[in-house]
Amino acid sequence: MSTIVKICGLTTADTLEAAVEAGADMVGFVFFPASPRHLDIDFADALGRQVRSRAAKVALTVDADDDLLDAIVEQLRPNWLQFHGSESPERVRSIKRIYGLPVMKAIAVAGPDDLSVLPDYAAVADRILFDARPPKDATRPGGLGAAFDWKLLDGVNLKLPFLVSGGINAGNVAEALRVTRAQGVDVSSGVETSPGEKDPDLIRDFIRAARAA
Ligand SMILES: O=C(O)c1ccccc1NCC(=O)[C@H](O)[C@H](O)COP(=O)(O)O
């Protein structure tokens, strides 16, 4: 199976087009006001239309309430929901039932203890995304360009696909995939020139490197 490549935090038509044309499988739109990649729903809707089924649209939220999820699902019509907060397994199960959409749950990793929640989320999610645990004073729980120790995933044995993220770029994506044996990879900061500013060339380089890995 080919590596699942997700480019997250797209905010412009140009960079979205670069990601889709270069063959991204999943394109992520962030709905979290404190993020430099936050989108309002009308603009996300316009970007979503541009995708035209060429990639899966992923709506990333952080402990979103039902009203926000209703609005996102109604307007963007995402193919996936990504939960990057402290959504419980019960909340994941309930949202899946309400919207009938697959869910990717982010698990924040800093040490081996962080993996103890895996069985509970693996029972309800469709994909798991391993990301670096943010520092306590971080203003957002992801998209920080920080990596975790990939060797922590050694021995992880999931029946569902998982993606690795956090501090990955074209230069280290092959190593990230080799060490973690992940089915996919997710990047945001690693294809940016500054937080929130994606670069079409960096996106293309990243996708090429991920495909070659
Ligand atoms: O991107 C954000 O600003 C963001 C805000 C709130 C929660 C999650 C967020 N991003 C997560 C991602 O973009 C990816 O899933 C991943 O963490 C990318 O990490 P990195 O390549 O290190 O930026």
UniProtKB/Swiss-Prot annotation:
Gene3D superfamilies listed in its UniProt record: Aldolase class I (3.20.20.70)
Catalytic activity: N-(5-phospho-beta-D-ribosyl)anthranilate = 1-(2-carboxyphenylamino)-1-deoxy-D-ribulose 5-phosphate
Gene Ontology process terms (BP): L-tryptophan biosynthetic process
Pathway, per record: Amino-acid biosynthesis; L-tryptophan biosynthesis; L-tryptophan from chorismate: step 3/5
SUPFAM superfamilies given in the database record: Ribulose-phoshate binding barrel
Pfam families, per database record: PRAI
Keyword tags: Amino-acid biosynthesis, Aromatic amino acid biosynthesis, Isomerase, Tryptophan biosynthesis
EC number, UniProt record: 5.3.1.24
GO molecular function annotations of the record: phosphoribosylanthranilate isomerase activity
Enzyme class: isomerase
Amino-acid biosynthesis keyword on record: yes
Protein name, per record: N-(5'-phosphoribosyl)anthranilate isomerase
Taxonomic classification: Bacteria, Pseudomonadati, Pseudomonadota, Alphaproteobacteria, Hyphomicrobiales
